Each structure stands twice: as C-alpha cells, then as structure tokens.
Amino acid sequence: PGPCCNDKCVCKEGGCKEGCQCTSCRCSPCEKCSSGCKCANKEECSKTCSKACSCCPT
C-alpha cells in the first residue's frame, strides 16, 4: 500500500492530508487542534478560535 494508508494515515479535517492517494484511507476524528489554536479540542476550537483549526497528526 502507498503512503498515508491505514495506520500511517495522516489526519486532517474531513479526511486525509492532501497528496495521499489511498482511497481506503479514513482518519479517525482528531481530538486536538493544531494550526496555532490553543483550544483543548475541535469543539472548543470552532466556538472560540477566529481561524479554522487543522487536526493534529496524532
């Protein structure tokens, strides 16, 4: 299998990181936010951060 598949999947909002070409790649929802967002989780992030947050890769 190619990069970003299954357990090597790189998380991103709504699916997989751009450039990953594995059609079976499905990321589980990320709990923490990156992109300079200091909120504890995606829900807080969407309510209190001025910019949209990206998922952490873990």
Curated annotation (Swiss-Prot):
Sequence positions that bind a divalent metal cation 5: 33, 37, 55-56
Residues the entry annotates as binding a divalent metal cation 6: 39, 45, 49, 56
Binding site for a divalent metal cation 3: 11, 16, 25, 27
Binding site for a divalent metal cation 2: 5, 9, 22, 25
Domain of life of the native organism: Eukaryota
Positions annotated to bind a divalent metal cation 4: 30, 33, 49, 53
Chain intervals for the UniProt region annotation (Beta): 1-28
Gene Ontology terms, MF aspect: metal ion binding
Binding positions (a divalent metal cation 1): 4-5, 16, 20
Residue segments, region Alpha: 29-58
Keywords: Metal-binding, Metal-thiolate cluster
Family of this protein: Belongs to the metallothionein superfamily. Type 3 family.
Function as written in the Swiss-Prot or TrEMBL entry: Metallothioneins have a high content of cysteine residues that bind various heavy metals. Class I MTS in marine crustacea are involved in the sequestration of elevated levels of heavy-metal ions.
Name used for this protein in its record: Metallothionein-1
Organism annotation: Scylla serrata
Organism taxonomic ancestry: Eukaryota, Metazoa, Ecdysozoa, Arthropoda, Crustacea
